[in-house]
Structure formats: C-alpha cells, structure tokens
Amino acid sequence: MASSRCPAPRGCRCLPGASLAWLGTVLLFLADWVLLRTALPRIFSLLVPTALPLLRVWAVGLSRWAVLWLGACGVLRATVGSKSENAGAQGWLAALEPLAAALGLALPGLALFRELISWGAPGSADSTRLLHWGSHPSAFVVSYAAALPAAALWHKLGSLWVPGGQGGSGNPVRRLLGCLGSETRRLSLFLVLVVLSSLGEMAIPFFTGRLTDWILQDGSADTFTRNLTLMSILTIASAVLEFVGDGIYNNTMGHVHSHLQGEVFGAVLRQETEFFQQNQTGNITSRVTEDTSTLSDSLSENLSLFLWYLVRGLCLLGIMLWGSVSLTMVTLVTLPLLFLLPKKVGKWYQLLEVQVRESLAKSSQVAIEALSAMPTVRSFANEEGEAQKFREKLQEIKTLNQKEAVAYAVNSWTTSISGMLLKVGILYIGGQLVTSGAVSSGNLVTFVLYQMQFTQAVEVLLSIYPRVQKAVGSSEKIFEYLDRTPRCPPSGLLTPLHLEGLVQFQDVSFAYPNRPDVLVLQGLTFTLHPGEVTALVGPNGSGKSTVAALLQNLYQPTGGQLLLDGKPLPQYEHRYLHRQVAAVGQEPQVFGRSLQENIAYGLTQKPTMEEITAAAVKCGAHSFISGLPQGYDTEVGEAGSQLSGGQRQAVALARALIRKPCVLILDDATSALDANSQLQVEQLLYESPERYSRSVLLITQHLSLVEQADHILFLEGGAIREGGTHQQLMEKKGCYWAMVQAPADAPE
C-alpha cells in the first residue's frame, strides 16, 4: 500500500525537527519583540478608556498570552506532529506554553498587586505608567528573565500531572487527590493553617526591619516594646498553628493510608484465580503493603514539606514584590544561577567520586588476585610485575583524588560565591534605593531576610521534587491493581431457594492460561446425581484436581459448559454458589485464627456453637478439639502450624459440612486422617441420612471409599476412559482393574 504522504519536491531540503523547533521559537520571540511589545499597547490605548488603566493592562497581557500560546502550539504541532503527540514533547519545547502564560500574565499580575496594596490611595499604583514601561526594551528583557525560570518550574511540576501509561490509572496526581475522599475538609483546614503560620513566620524579618528603622531614627522605647511584643506574639502563634496543622495532617494521612490499603487489598481479592498464579505472592503483598506504605510515608513527609514551603515561598514572593519590585526581579533573575551552576559542578564531583570508588575496587582486585595466586606469581618470578601493576592503580587513584579535591573546592566555591553574589547584588541595588529614598534601611534589612528565606524555600522545593515524583511512581503501581478489571465473569444473580445438586459436565475442555496450547481436559462429559457418590480416579496429572477446580468456578472452561441444576455455573451469585458447593483438598488452608472462626469461615450469618460442634462431630474433629485447653477458642497459629495434617483436614471437612452444601467435593481430603476419622467420613458419605440431599465428587487414593461409590470414572490424559460401578469395572479388566491390581506402593 502506498504511503499517503506526498513526496517533497525535488531540490527541497526538509529541516530536521530540532532545527525547525529553534527556528519557530526564534521567529515567535521576534514577533513578540517587534509586533506585540509595541503594537498591543497602542491598540488597547484606543480601545479601552483612559479611566480604566488596569483593564487596559490586563487586555494587553491576555492578548499577548493568547498570541504567544497559539504560536507555541504551532511550533509544537510542526515539530512533533499531530496534537495527540504534543504531550510527548521533550525538553524545552514542552515549556513554551507555560512560558507564554508567564510572559502574558507577569505585567497584569504586577499591576493588580500594586493596585491592591495601594487600596484607598487612588492613582498611586499608576497602571498607565506601568503599561508604558512594559513596552520599553528593558522591561522586555526583565520579563523574559523572570518568566524563563517560572516557566521551567511550571513545566517541571507539570510532569507530575502526566497521565499514567498503564493500567488506565489516568492522571496520577488527580488520582492521589481522589484518594483523599472525605478528608478534603481536614486538608482545607490544614492549608488555611499553613497560610496563617507562614504569614506568622514572616513577623521576625518584618519587625527586624521596623526595629532597624527605630534604632536609626532614635525612636521611643514604647515603639521598641510594641514591635518586640507583636513579633513575639506572631512568632508564638505561628509555631502553635504549625503544630496544630502537622497534627491534623498526620491524622488525615493515617486515615488515607488505611483507606487506600483496604481498597487495594479488596481489588486484589476480586481478581481471577489465574492472576494469583501469574504473579508471585511476594510481589502482590509488596504492592498491597510496601507500595502503599511508601506512598503514605511520602505523602505524610514530602507532600507536607512541599505544601509548607510552596505556600511559604508564595507568601514570601508576594511580600518581596510589595517591598521592592526591582529587588525581587533581581532575585528571580539570579535564582537559576544560584541553583543550576552548583548543580552542574556537583554532578562533576559525583562522577569523580564514582570513578575513585571504581579505581579502588580495581586496585583491590589486583592485590587479591596476586595474593590468592602467590604460588603462580612466584613460579613465574613476577613479584615485581604485580607490585608495579598495583603501583599503577594507586597512581590512577592519586590522580582521581586530586581531581576530586579540585571538584570539591569548585563545588563549595560555586555554592558560596553564587549566594554571595546574590547578596552583594541585593545590597548594592538596595543601597542605591536607600540613598535615593525609595526604601528605608529597615525595609532593606527586611527584604534581605525575606530573600534568604525565599531562596531556602526554593532550594527545599527542588530537593523534595524527586521524592514527590517517586511517590507518584508508587501510586501508578497501586492504581494498576485498583483499575485492573478481573478476567473472570462477573457474579451472577441466581439465588434459588432450593437446589437439587445436579451437576452436568457437557463436552468440557480446559487449558490453563499460562499454557493455552496444552489441553488438560478434553471433551469431558458426565453427570453428578443428587444422593450419589461419584468417584474420580486415575493416574497423577490426569486432570482430577482440575475437574474439582472447575466445579468450584475457580476457572472457566475453554470449551463446553458446566451446569448446576441446568444453569451455567457463572450465572449463580458468588456467595450463594460457594455456600452450595463446598470443597476440601489434600492440603487445606487453615487460617491463623481460632478453631471456631476457621469452621465458620466465610459464612455471612454467624452459626451457633451447636451448629459448629455438630459439623465437627460428623468428621471426627470434635474429639481432638474438645481435648484442647481452650476448646474451640484455641488459636491454631499461622496457617494452622499448631495442628497436624490430619487435624487440618478434619477442620476443613467441618468447615465444608457446616454449610450443608448440595455439592460436596473431596479432593484426597482424607489422606491424613486417622482410622477412626476415616471411618466417620465413610459413614458420612454412605450411611448418613444427609447423603440423599447432596451430590458428592470423591477424589481419593483409598480404594475402600472408592469401592462403595455409586459411580466410578477413570480419568486419564484429560479424558474419561471408562466408567461404572466397582463390580462392572473389575469385570471389564480395563484401566481401573489394572490400577486396583497394582501394588499399593507402585506409582499411578
């Protein structure tokens, strides 16, 4: 099939994606410089009345945002293809859209902020003058210098909101917020406390500046006392609010952890049987416990810190803008230098550290090889050669250590010098503002303290970001389980008041999901009649236990159908079906609970002690239970570790009989019972009046039980080879006769 894409004209050279991206971005910025910077203020000066300067500024800013956003979308579309691929844009290209927003909203936001802080003094904000300044080349440069780090941070945080790629988990952060559920009110209260506490923390820098002015102006003692008292009150209030907020947050996260872990465990329990065979129990347990705990710990610690410092940073930024726009711009412009340069040098230092460790390992390997092979070294008279080789490795380590020392010094120097340059720049520009009377000395001191706190907040946010990403990664694994749809059919609705227990296998075939090409059962057709015991015998691996698993609806046939009283098994309601069909295996699972709880396991209505005792008596379990010090309240240990194999089988038989099922499956369920208990089970199957109210599928090695069965089926290779009563099959002298005649210890 021919490609639908038209070939490029001969002689036309298509630009590669990277070149096209750079060209489109440069043209977009040129358009912003040549057209938008000068044209938009003139246009809206004509359209918007002079009496509404703030509206004019916002109209210009929003228009600039819209034009730049359309241009950014055009560059993305031309570079990465269709709109559906824009989400996969890599690197700086993906930051074009947030950059357009930052450039468009910076000036209107500043104008609105100045209007708000000058409320009650009309005209003092002077939005018109701000608009004219915004079209000046210096303002253009400052706007880009401030918008670039903001757009980079926006894009970086936006990567947390990228939809998960698997499991249909959707947006992971939104899913995490959705897990908060009913805790929204508490979290809202927590955020309010964070804001109030952050504002209270800013009392110390604010009043420090006030006290500085008081000292320089030789103010009264009352002013000093009043400022110091207010600072103390606000600081104490901030600490109290932080304590209360942390308590509310940790309590909320505890509730979220319990709720989320319960939801994940419930989702796992709803999965089909094949899921538990294809996934190791340890991996599933790790998802349910460790991943949810990791997520909860990260939410409790990292998200809390992230919110604290994010709110604190925003409050500090607002107060810094209120104090001095020019000093704030200097801070924002120099922040990338403050963090990026030490980060790059730090990577070089870390790389050298790795190389030093590798060289140490190689030198150790040389020494170990020489010392462990001394007879060989001596027989070849190569002692000096090995020593020289070791000295060469030491010389490599020495060279790397020297480089590492230089890198460490440069790393420390860049960290300190970048912070020092920022402080010097702030003090230099601030000193000029103080000299000109634009700000007071106290305001400059306040700003410097705020700037130090703001820098610390940004540094903490950048350090916490990878840990928040890790939490998002953990949440995606958890949501894979929450969103996974079980591959078993949904629970049916049939719950008839009475079941006969007629079971029909109609041409049933089956292959396990992990081996779909290997049929375990092939065209199986037989019937279990109410009031009869049908014994299923055959060699190991013939499919007997698979028949029992299908009858429990643990798997679905790959061919044919399985009917209970004429209705397909999946049409019955899940709980109802497993009350009517009970099974006991050779190694039944007993839970680490009391014997009473194990016998009543899974019943929606708690049985009486008389019913529990009666079920235990029927299978011979009551005799050993009554001899225990705590009787039916005895804890059996993890997985029934305090019980013998026969006792576990007896408890499992009682657990099945208390349900009064219409279909009873015994899959080698008496192999570990003692003689008395086996006799009781034999009487239960063939002499009890209750036998006529249920169908029994018996899989066993005990021929004494098989001989009395109403019908015997010999299964081999997944197919029924012969069937009949014991007498009929012995007369045929076929497969069953050969099995009976074989020595007791011979393999089947």
UniProtKB/Swiss-Prot annotation:
Pfam families registered for this protein in UniProt: ABC_membrane (PF00664), ABC_tran (PF00005)
Coiled coil spans: none
Residue(s) at site: Inter-subunit salt bridge with TAPBP: 32
GO biological process terms, semicolon-separated: adaptive immune response; antigen processing and presentation of endogenous peptide antigen via MHC class I; protein transport; transmembrane transport
SMART domains in the cross-refs: AAA (SM00382)
Principal cellular location given in the protein's record: endoplasmic reticulum
Region annotated Part of the peptide-binding site, chain positions: 375-420, 453-487
Names of the cofactor(s): Mg(2+)
Outcome recorded upon mutating residue 273 to M: In allele Gogo-TAP1b
Boundaries of every ABC transporter domain copy: 503-742
Alphabetical list of InterPro entries matching this protein: AAA+_ATPase, ABC1_TM_dom, ABC1_TM_sf, ABC_Tap-like, ABC_transporter-like_ATP-bd, ABC_transporter-like_CS, P-loop_NTPase, Type_1_exporter
Residues given in the record as ATP binding sites: 538-546, 641-647, 701
Membrane topology of the entry: Multi-pass membrane protein
Topological domain spans for side Cytoplasmic: 1-15, 77-92, 155-186, 249-298, 350-418, 465-748
Binding-site residues, Mg(2+): 545
Gene3D superfamilies assigned to the protein according to its UniProt record, in alphabetical order: ABC transporter type 1, transmembrane domain (1.20.1560.10), P-loop containing nucleotide triphosphate hydrolases (3.40.50.300)
Lumenal side stretches: 37-53, 114-133, 208-227, 320-328, 440-443
Subcellular localization, as worded in the UniProt entry: Endoplasmic reticulum membrane
Family: Belongs to the ABC transporter superfamily. ABCB family. MHC peptide exporter (TC 3.A.1.209) subfamily.
Subunit and partners: Heterodimer of TAP1 and TAP2 (TAP1-TAP2). A component of the peptide loading complex (PLC), interacts via TAPBP with MHCI heterodimer; this interaction mediates peptide-MHCI assembly. Interacts with PSMB5 and PSMB8.
Protein's name in the database: Antigen peptide transporter 1
Origin species: Gorilla gorilla gorilla
Lineage: Eukaryota, Metazoa, Chordata, Craniata, Vertebrata
Gene from which the chain derives: TAP1
